[in-house]
Amino acid sequence: MDLRIDFRNPEQEIFFWSRKRNNRFGGGFGNGKTYVACQRAVVMLTTFSGYRMAFCRQVYKNLRATTMQTFFKICPKEFILTHDENFGLTVFINGSRIYWLHLDQMDEATAKGFEINSLVIDQAEEVEESIFLLMDARVGRWDKAIVPQPLLDQFPEWPRHKVYGQPLV
């Protein structure tokens, strides 16, 4: 199945292709921040089997009403095995997962249990810095995502680029 990726503005394209560990995309209402984050998430979740991602927002009803709605507009239904809105978990047919989290009641003990490959915090300005740092520390804790063989063939020194010595992901 082909996934069509469209960019509404140059900033979306820069964000989508960025290889930096932490990315921020700011701007006015309706400029496509959530949309491009969801596009990028679908690509990561479907490319790497077993990939784990957390989508967060301060309040769950806002996450469900906005971010989740945008994600499911973009992600083809054929990729989804199960989605439990009440539990906040989406499982893909390739074993990848999304944890849908509200951060207004997040505590350190709960956050320490997450092992994820990446994190999207929608409306990050609503989130306390201490919670952001706690969630950010969980990124990279899950090492069971499977790198597709064509990528390994193309980049045999994965995850390091032989010229730059930098991580490719």
Spans of features found by a protein language model:
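Phosphate/NTP-binding elements of NTP-utilizing enzymes
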Residues: M1-V169
